[in-house]
Amino acid sequence: MVKGTTSMGKHGRSKTHIRCRRCGRHSFNVAKGYCAACGFGRSKRIRHYNWANKKVNRIRIV
């Protein structure tokens, strides 16, 4: 019946992320129902951003 520090220890029991069916990465959030890596469950298009890739010599490394 408390909401402070003692209840924070109960968060580590269940799994937050499981393996995604679309991208195969361990990024599918069970509670929210979508993948943090590819966006499965939230959109039909695969989640992709250019800032996620590091640019070396002005050439984007994929």
Curated annotation (Swiss-Prot):
Zn finger region (C4-type): 20-38
Residues the entry annotates as binding Zn(2+): 20, 23, 35, 38
Keyword terms of this UniProt record: Metal-binding, Ribonucleoprotein, Ribosomal protein, RNA-binding, rRNA-binding, Zinc, Zinc-finger
Single GO MF annotation: rRNA binding
One Gene Ontology term from the biological process aspect of the record: translation
Coiled-coil boundaries: none
SUPFAM superfamilies per record: Zn-binding ribosomal proteins (SSF57829)
Similarity remark: Belongs to the eukaryotic ribosomal protein eL37 family.
Role: Binds to the 23S rRNA.
Protein name: Large ribosomal subunit protein eL37
Species per Swiss-Prot/TrEMBL record: Desulfurococcus amylolyticus (strain DSM 18924 / JCM 16383 / VKM B-2413 / 1221n) (Desulfurococcus kamchatkensis)
Phylogenetic placement of the source organism: Archaea, Thermoproteota, Thermoprotei, Desulfurococcales, Desulfurococcaceae
